[in-house]
Amino acid sequence: DVSTIYNGYFSDASRMFMIGNVHPAIKRLVDVTKECLEIGIQAAQPWARLGDVGAAIQQHAEKNGYSVVRELCGHGVGIKFHEEPDVEHFGRKGTGMMILPGMTFTIEPMFFMG
């Protein structure tokens, strides 16, 4: 996880690497998590709702046998490192804050195996 501050604004970025011989179950978890991130990004369109993002992520994760970590979530970024809104990785389509053009937030899906 890496963050920089530029002209008073924060960033938040991360990368994950698998090193050595990774158990197939762990590789699958990593692959599905990346798929969920991509699905969440696709759902995060102007005029959609944050619940649309969470629902899309949750549906794909559960379809693949994983459960969503509900205690941690994505978040807004700006002049503070963690700002509103909370971007949960579960939810109901059509609920939550409306996504407006220009909003900046993270999508950080995390799952339990099982």
Where are the language model's segments positioned?
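Active-site neighborhoods and metal-handling regions in enzymes and metal-associated proteins
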Residues: 1-114
